[in-house]
Amino acid sequence: SPLGTVKCSPWHYKGNTLLMGDAAHAIVPFYGQGMNASFEDVVEFDTILEAHDKPSTKSDWETIFTAYESTRKIDTDAIADLAIDNFHEMKDHVNNQLFRKKRHLEMALEKKFPDEYTSKYSLVTFNEHIGYREAMLKGRAQDKAILNMLAEGEIDLNSDLRQVLDK
């Protein structure tokens, strides 16, 4: 069956209905983050709910639902984009020599400088301290920089890793 991505808005209706998880933001499985994103929804909703003392009216709930969506949507849209990007990366680039060199350098940088460098994949998958959007922006910038330096011959697989990191 076909795979799809859901990016809808609003996620709520008149203070009595709220979409969460795949109902609000289904994503293709190419990052393996769908369930994690849904669990993050629940944590964020709980945090917002605790900040509002005993909501009792539809207006109270509408305020909560609006706050929840405004904090989550940028991250759920980002993981949806990242999952599609990862599909294309796996489909089109795994045999590309430049991509393979980039991946080799990323792995070496992460291993040698774990406190200073984290690849896009690791930012998304293993770093709970930043949201998907921040991970996407930082990861894309790193990918672009490494690919450009490789393509322009500024670095190669034999380059000193400290110098690569400093660039």
Residue ranges of each PLM-predicted region?
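FAD/FMN-dependent oxidoreductases across multiple families
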Residues: S1-D60
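C-terminal helical "tail/cap" subdomain of flavin- and related membrane-associated enzymes
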Residues: T47-K167
